[in-house]
């Protein structure tokens, strides 16, 4: 149903132009203090979108999110202490 998606962190010179980013993907978050926007786009169009966004005059730099590539299953994690006790 849904394809693989990845977020791009787009650093801007000014937030005035943040609305223009809507046509390049779904805007998830805009930080006013740090002047960046998190834009989601399809994985297969990622390189193309980065190239198009880098051409825009109000974009400082773009970084890919590494969240899809991080391992989220941890091996030697300690069990929950509350679940150790059997209260039955």
From Swiss-Prot:
Protein name: UPF0298 protein Bcer98_2635
Taxonomic source organism: Bacillus cytotoxicus (strain DSM 22905 / CIP 110041 / 391-98 / NVH 391-98)
Alphabetized InterPro entries for the sequence: DUF2129
Any one annotated GO CC term: cytoplasm
Subcellular location: Cytoplasm
Protein keywords: Cytoplasm
Superkingdom per UniProt: Bacteria
Pfam families for this protein: DUF2129 (PF09902)
Similarity annotation: Belongs to the UPF0298 family.
